[in-house]
Amino acid sequence: MTLSDLITRVRSYTRDTTGTLFTASDVKDFINEAIDKLRQIKELENIKHLSNDSDVIVLLPSQYHYMTAVYSASRCFSQDEQHYQAQTYMDEFMGLFSLVELGIKEGTISIYDENGQIIRDTHEPDGVENVYFT
């Protein structure tokens, strides 16, 4: 989805089809804030912010692009003090975030760079070695 598509999706979620409630700048900033959240996942740390209407989210599989619009809708509702709606959309985003994170770790979701190569976190977590009972 392009940035323009994502903004349209946010406007649909927030029932702001005329663009009178939330500025395009705020919506775009919240979409980029969602991208910042996705950067917490090691394999997605190189996702770039969207600045032009034709920009597309790279690295993240296309079926998950809409989750940035879900996050943005949550922030818009929060800004408008519609806390129930804000929490509902944030819960949906966090569920999707966990699904993506787990899918990447389990290997069911593959992340590809611009060259078509799979991105994997090869760093092994720290552990304790048992040297007494071997």
Where are these regions (language model features)?
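Secondary-structure capping and boundary motifs in well-ordered enzyme cores
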Residues: 2, 60-69
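Short secondary-structure subsegments characteristic of cysteine-rich extracellular domains
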Residues: 90-100
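Conserved short "hinge" loops at termini or chain/domain junctions
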Residues: 1-59, 87, 101-134
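Short conserved catalytic/interaction loops centered on acidic-Pro-aromatic/His motifs
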Residues: 81-91
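Short, hydrophobic/amphipathic alpha-helical patches that form generic packing surfaces
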Residues: 66-78
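Hydrophobic alpha-helical segments
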Residues: 31, 69-70, 83
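Extended, low-complexity, turn-rich repeat/linker tracts enriched in Gly/Pro/Ser/Thr and Asp/Glu
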Residues: 17-18, 78-80
